[in-house]
């Protein structure tokens, strides 16, 4: 079934995976498809994500200026009215403690597309993802190759430093992804 058939009004789609797997690239692809269908899209970015001021992937792919409305917020409850919006796209969904708010938008017949990490650097699922998961109509897992051995599927996010803060935004300067074999080494 094609992706566009899965993105229906009133549905919640969730894309999970480790860092550097292409989740934001997938979201940009969805936005491009929705734009071709003349849907009004709102992209919500967490203020906890201090990595970039633009909507950009780790590989440098960016949303075009004015491609969709971009809202930066600490909580989804602060976003305000989305009455003229067809689709809500949320990157780094695990950053939003009130991610369950997406159910209300789905009840308003909006297309909801979420992307987030499969687990923290401690290999534990983020609670916002756990709470929204039962309400998702479609879930996609995107993997990547281990950054240590380049042989196996990496599903673990590993922090390079000893900082124990749960939310610490960063890229390859702070994190790598690795497979189960390399995690145990």
From Swiss-Prot:
It comes from the Viruses. This is Thymidine kinase. Zn(2+) binds at residues 146, 149, 179, 182. One of its GO terms (biological process) is thymidine metabolic process. Its EC number is 2.7.1.21. It comes from African swine fever virus (isolate Pig/Kenya/KEN-50/1950) (ASFV). Gene3D superfamilies: 3.30.60.20, P-loop containing nucleotide triphosphate hydrolases (3.40.50.300). Belongs to the thymidine kinase family. It catalyses: thymidine + ATP = dTMP + ADP + H(+). The active site is at 92 (proton acceptor). Disulfide bonds: none annotated. SUPFAM superfamilies: P-loop containing nucleoside triphosphate hydrolases (SSF52540). ATP binds at residues 17-24. Phosphorylates thymidine. ASFV replicates in the cytoplasm of infected cells and contains genes encoding a number of enzymes needed for DNA synthesis, including thymidine kinase. Important for growth in swine macrophages in vitro and is a virus virulence factor in swine. Substrate binds at residues 121, 166-170. Keywords: ATP-binding, DNA synthesis, Kinase, Metal-binding, Nucleotide-binding, Transferase, Virulence, Zinc. One of its GO terms (molecular function) is thymidine kinase activity.
